[in-house]
A protein has these predicted regions:
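C-terminal and inter-domain tail/linker signature
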Residues: 1-147
Length: 147
């Protein structure tokens, strides 16, 4: 039973990443619980709630409009019960401004990044209740010339 649940959650994960790549915010919202908790690299505190997670995701696309996760196939995909873990190549170009850790805006660098991106997701009833996102933030910032 858990295996079937894990496999169906993995398929939902793939459709979530498809929605990310297409900026299909309706599907993106459907894949997350209303009170989802999301941790990104560099955050002091997790993002709470789908509305806040969607808002930060839309902002990310303003900075990196061509960003893309390669999820067909994933480099790694693991599903067990209510949990999925995926590793994908993640790339994009900084063509929009970005808010720095000090709150100041960083001008577009027009430089590309390419890092591995790992998502660990906890699923309940077909929605992510907790999502942990991992990628080499320092490497990304160095590649776009911010560090």
């Amino acid at each position: 039973m858990a295996e079937t649940n894990g496999l169906s959650n993995m398929e939902l994960m793939r459709t979530l990443d498809d929605s990310w790549n297409a900026q299909d915010w309706k599907t993106f919202e459907k894949r997350h619980a209303t009170n989802t908790v999301v941790s990104w690299p560099g955050q002091a505190d997790p993002t709470r709630g789908i509305n806040n997670h969607k808002a930060e995701s839309v902002e990310f696309f303003k900075t990196f409009p061509d960003n893309h996760l390669i999820n067909h196939p994933y480099k790694v995909e693991i599903a067990q019960g209510e949990w999925t873990c995926t590793v994908a190549d993640f790339s994009g170009t900084m063509t929009g401004p970005m808010k720095g850790p000090d709150g100041k805006m960083i001008a577009p660098a027009n430089k590309k990044f390419h890092v591995e991106f790992c998502t660990v997701a906890h699923w309940k009833d077909g929605e992510i209740v907790e999502e942990k996102l991992f990628y080499d933030l320092v490497g990304l910032l160095k590649q776009i010339g911010v560090m």
